[in-house]
Amino acid sequence: MPLLNSVTTPYAEALLQVVNENSQTEEMVSEVKQLLELVNDSPELEKALSSPILETDAKKKIIIEIFSNKVNSSLLNFLKLLADRQRIGILTSILDRFLEIYRENSNIALATVTSAVELTDEQKGLITKKIINIAGTEKLELVTKIDPSLIGGFVASVGSKVIDASLASQIRKLGLTLSK
């Protein structure tokens, strides 16, 4: 991915600079997350934006039509710039990189917690506190996923660290111990 990062980083940093100059950081981070979710949930939109067949003006028209009421003007202008520069096809990578740089600059760790069932707010709070201690950070962004194959418990990952407290893992370990 280093090659893609060399393309995405300048755009992500430019967006972050605009955001910081306009004191819109929290608002923009929220909008970028919503935009990423929207694009990731719509394969047709992603295909259209990355299509080499569609002209730049057509892509800009799509951007304006879909996003003009959903994002602020700075982000809308950024999307149009990406279309002009033929970079709208890597939009999700640029936005992911933007969030990555934002987290690095703000000392926010990103943790992914996968559980067998939906976690309650209390459980999320307890897991967040535990991960903050392990990660050695003051702030944490928690992404939750559901995987019924875990049977119970959870698997948390932050950076290169993984905490596997799932029932499926414990059953696997027990099976290995009994087979010896």
Swiss-Prot record:
It is found in: Cellular thylakoid membrane. SUPFAM superfamilies: N-terminal domain of the delta subunit of the F1F0-ATP synthase (SSF47928). It is a peripheral membrane protein. Belongs to the ATPase delta chain family. This is ATP synthase subunit delta. GO terms for molecular function: proton-transporting ATP synthase activity, rotational mechanism. Its main location: membrane. Gene3D superfamilies: N-terminal domain of the delta subunit of the F1F0-ATP synthase (1.10.520.20). Keywords: ATP synthesis, CF(1), Hydrogen ion transport, Ion transport, Membrane, Thylakoid, Transport. F-type ATPases have 2 components, F(1) - the catalytic core - and F(0) - the membrane proton channel. F(1) has five subunits: alpha(3), beta(3), gamma(1), delta(1), epsilon(1). CF(0) has four main subunits: a(1), b(1), b'(1) and c(10-14). The alpha and beta chains form an alternating ring which encloses part of the gamma chain. F(1) is attached to F(0) by a central stalk formed by the gamma and epsilon chains, while a peripheral stalk is formed by the delta, b and b' chains. PANTHER family: ATP SYNTHASE DELTA CHAIN.
